[in-house]
Swiss-Prot record:
The lineage of its organism: Archaea, Methanobacteriati, Methanobacteriota, Thermococci, Thermococcales. It is a peripheral membrane protein. Coiled coil: none annotated. This is A-type ATP synthase subunit A. Keywords: ATP synthesis, ATP-binding, Cell membrane, Hydrogen ion transport, Ion transport, Membrane, Nucleotide-binding, Translocase, Transport. It is found in: Cell membrane. SMART domains: AAA (SM00382). HAMAP family: ATP_synth_A_arch. Its EC number is 7.1.2.2. InterPro entries: AAA+_ATPase, ATP-synt_VA_C, ATP-synth_a_Xtn, ATP_synth_asu-like_sf, ATP_synth_asu_arc, ATPase_a/bsu_AS, ATPase_F1/V1/A1_a/bsu_N, ATPase_F1/V1/A1_a/bsu_N_sf. It comes from Thermococcus gammatolerans (strain DSM 15229 / JCM 11827 / EJ3). Belongs to the ATPase alpha/beta chains family. Has multiple subunits with at least A(3), B(3), C, D, E, F, H, I and proteolipid K(x). GO terms for molecular function: ATP binding; ATP hydrolysis activity; proton-transporting ATP synthase activity, rotational mechanism; proton-transporting ATPase activity, rotational mechanism. It catalyses: ATP + H2O + 4 H(+)(in) = ADP + phosphate + 5 H(+)(out).
Amino acid sequence: MGRIVRVTGPLVVADGMKGAKMYEVVRVGEMGLIGEIIRLEGDRAVIQVYEETAGIKPGEPVIGTGSSLSVELGPGLLTSMYDGIQRPLEKLRELSGDFIARGLTAPALPRDKKWHFTPTVKVGDRVTGGDILGVVPETSIIEHKILVPPWVEGEIVEIAEEGDYTVEEVIAKVKKPDGTIEELKMYHRWPVRVKRPYKNKLPPEVPLITGQRTIDTFFSIAKGGTAAIPGPFGSGKTVTQHQLAKWSDAQVVVYIGCGERGNEMTDVLEEFPKLKDPKTGKPLMERTVLIANTSNMPVAAREASIYTGITIAEYFRDQGYDVALMADSTSRWAEALREISGRLEEMPGEEGYPAYLASKIAEFYERAGRVVTLGSEPRVGSVSVIGAVSPPGGDFSEPVVQNTLRVVKVFWALDADLARRRHFPAINWLRSYSLYLDAVQDWWHKNVDPEWRKMRDTAMALLQKEAELQEIVRIVGPDALPDREKAILIVTRMLREDYLQQDAFDEVDTYCPPKKQVTMMRVILNFYNRTMEAVDRGVPVDEIARLPVREKIGRMKFEPDVEKIRALIDETNAQFEELFKKYGV
């Protein structure tokens, strides 16, 4: 037990902390605020406090808890909403009303709720860390697998029968090799700064299907991959994150609102329970864990919220699920690091950020991956991390963006100009890239269409050609272009407006399945091939631009039936044949 000697914002310095450990959780002051030791010098400890420190004075006590910042992992995580240190916000509201009183704590998992447990092991079985003891139907979508904690191995000497239990009841007893008995409950605790172990990492070969055409077709992300969405204010970062949280084919979604506006978390809370999962027809909230750490909450908790979120994601990965983690926004976390670092009087790096910013960001993204989990029966699970970055003024040369780009493999650059033109998602196809294309193309070729990569590359080349032509058009006007190049501009406009643009608020267009994406691409590229043929045969470009099929191609994104979209290929061919007859070519 120590005494406070100095308070500067979220940082508290305490004396007399002999025996305290680095990253140990402490209770600060008379109110018992939650804090974490981030520096030790002799018996003096520097503590970052996860709550508002107003009113705390020197001389008040600091009490160590003996444990590091940990999360509870077990049934009850899904559909919950936590703050950055895994306090359940609903529970805190019951205790203190709409505003959180300081020093309040509540167990992260409900202690009184009974879960129906079905054992999958029997007495005498040998178990190791990561084995499944039994299953609990946590929601109608997700079956929660009760895992043996990674540090336990031995022989089952007692296992609970099928029935209803709370998370505090002992459901199994394991005799360890040294003869001691370990009692296992439905949940266990895990320190957030330590990554959960696994057997080995697998290459990311399966794409995370998001239903967003720009992302799936042009800049794919693999399951277990990492992506960054940088963009200036109002360019659609949060809406893109919401779209991915709603429609990506991950089985569990962890959404971290880290230092963003409170009304954005409210949007998620209001929308998700109403939205149905396209695969199961059940509310999306049933597969979601929300971590709300809005911009008016204490700065230090932002760092904790990032680690809390990724630890929960790794836990579901260990059960064999594909998890998508959205962090919105990692810039706010970096700003919190900068503020704490400044108060610690550390040497500032670029733009005032601490020198260790790069390693902190890398450490976070490195916890993503597709892995073979621990346990006697190997399972495959993945954590895909998608982090939004909000550089001030949309400047991509800023340290947070640059350090993020070093470690992520997919870059979706949001563009304020596209957003102003009402082109959403405002992902700039000339600046963005994905390094997973070669890895995921086999999956696309096997499961969707063997010509996927060829079509994608053709479309990309056309869009790049358009950017070159636009320069010329700006100088000399469109009439100076040869017919072939005028025709390219017609097709690329179709690609931009009828393919890349996607309406997040339209019932059909908000989610576009892979088969439909490929069929739409085929329709547009078929139009391109016929257009080039027509121009070479001498058909005027104006005639091609007036073809009635163009309007139908423009509307195909709102058509749920893939066969009707495919029929547009024959219709296009028929209209071109008529043109050829008309001009006798």
